[in-house]
């Protein structure tokens, strides 16, 4: 059986997340995936598939390109424009329901305000490597998808 994996998941490794009004250790963390990957790598019937880089095009096809661009630089901008912080989360959130009957609004310019525009919860803080880890996860999903579609197109038609 084939499996798809990247070590880049280590790049998203926050120490805390805000959930239920408290600072908590994240439930999803690199060590959890490391254990799964180790079990697969040492299993006699598993084969790791090398990933195909897909770039940002597929991501921007399904997400607001401005949000993708923002997330690519948000952590670094926050360090310069607001303060040095290992984890970055929004302080406030844009509430589109408050704008009912008005135009759709536009993203604010300050990075700390943009966090609340593009992010909508506090259990996934941004860290220095979050964007790279997220784009690598897309390569995992799309490489697997490519393989499935390739095998379907190669299958004989009955």
Q: What spans do the regions from the language model cover?
A:
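HDAC/HDAC-like amidohydrolase catalytic core signature
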Residues: 1-158
């Amino acid at each position: 059986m084939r499996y798809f994996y990247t070590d880049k998941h280590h790049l998203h490794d926050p120490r805390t997340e805000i959930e239920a009004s408290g600072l908590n250790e994240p439930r999803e963390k690199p060590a959890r995936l490391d254990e799964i990957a180790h079990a697969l790598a040492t299993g006699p019937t598993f084969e790791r598939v090398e990933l195909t880089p897909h770039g940002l095009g597929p991501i921007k096809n399904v997400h607001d390109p401005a949000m993708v661009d923002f997330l690519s630089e948000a952590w670094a901008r926050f360090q310069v424009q607001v303060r040095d912080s290992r984890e970055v989360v929004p302080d406030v959130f844009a509430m589109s329901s408050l704008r009912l009957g008005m135009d759709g609004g536009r993203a604010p310019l300050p990075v700390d305000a943009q966090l609340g525009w593009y992010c909508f919860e506090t259990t996934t803080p941004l860290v220095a490597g979050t964007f790279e880890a997220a784009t690598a996860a897309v390569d995992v999903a799309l490489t697997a998808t490519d393989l499935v579609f390739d095998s379907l197109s190669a299958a004989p038609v009955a």
